[in-house]
Amino acid sequence: YPFEKYDQIIVSEFMWGGMENITLTHNTDRTMFDSKAHPDHSSDGLVAHELAHQWFGNLITTRNWANIWLNEGFATYLSRLYITKDRGVDEGDYVRLNEIRGFMRADKAKRRPTVDFNYEEPFELFSSHVYAKGSLILTMLQDVLGEDGFWRSIKDYTIKNKLKTVETVDLKKSIENTTGQNLDWFFNQWLYEPGFPEYEVSWNYNQRMKELSIHVKQIQDLKTTSLFKMPIRILIDNGKKEEHIIWVEDLDSVFKIHSNKRPKMVIFNSGMRVPSILKTNKSVADLRYQLKNAPNALDRIWAAQELSKKKGRKIVEYALLECAQNDSFWTVRSEAYSSLSRLKSEYQTEDFDWIRTKEKDNRAKRSFIRSLRHQPKDLEVIKFLNDIIISDTSY
């Protein structure tokens, strides 16, 4: 820790969530929860974010507003690392999924680069283009450089720029000095230009050649977005689960991977490491298998979302309901209920009983309750909601 002390103070009706003054963080009183609100709500992410600012924001601070991601992106990233360390990989990945969603909402509202000198007021820069996308950029740098190269670069950047102001080029110099890699291509596409890749992916298997062919197109509008060069994780299940890395950089590419048998599952961009939109030729059967068998929670969530767009309503509803009641991770169960809501599914008596007696996570229960908006307002629904209001331990 770089300073002589660290204190936190709660400020009533504070206009921000938190403010990282050197050695004394101000937090809003909205971060204070009573015992009934835990564990459904937590301030851990905010507390970790503001503490991370003591290094990235105070010990080192951005030279200008255009590079504010060096403060906010780093703090958001390190906050997520804390959640991952404290609660596990699935929890950290779900935080990252919400970063992806936040970044894409911001991009839809206003497309702009992360490093942006084109603004009227500094306040307009404080969006998911710098918080969420900045955090995602650091995760992708971690994948490109590897764990050792990434952390040696961050250490070099922190030590060399202690008590100085910085711009993005200073981080890039530390990476080049430490690893010897020229990452012009990475910084240009993710920091100095706006947007994200959109992939259209299909695959087929050649039994005679024992070969899986993956056809990848980048289909983003090249008038507003560049082509992206990125390492992509491919997960294959052909009796055992194997992970491969392919480098996608062209408009249209075909990649061939040896496989002794036809894969039961092929996942492009496994774990959603690259923020992107993905279109595939996966059938309902493919998505059902992925929903049940993908080892990464984000890949199961993606399958649930895609199933909500498919025809074959009853078999899709059955798969989603089975996931909602059996997946090991609460966020996947919650997202499955959200997908059922998009299908305007109606629940049976046993589904209400299952929520009453088996679902232990209040956040998943909340998602189920939200999905009742499409349920007929009969006596069973009214009784269920009344029981929740009267007897449930959660707000």
Per-region residue spans from a language model:
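Alpha-helix C-terminal capping/termination sites
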Residues: 37, 143-144, 306-309, 342, ...
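Non-catalytic accessory/interaction domains
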Residues: 52, 148, 161-350, 354, ...
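C-terminal structured domain segments across diverse proteins
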Residues: 23, 329, 360-367, 374-377, ...
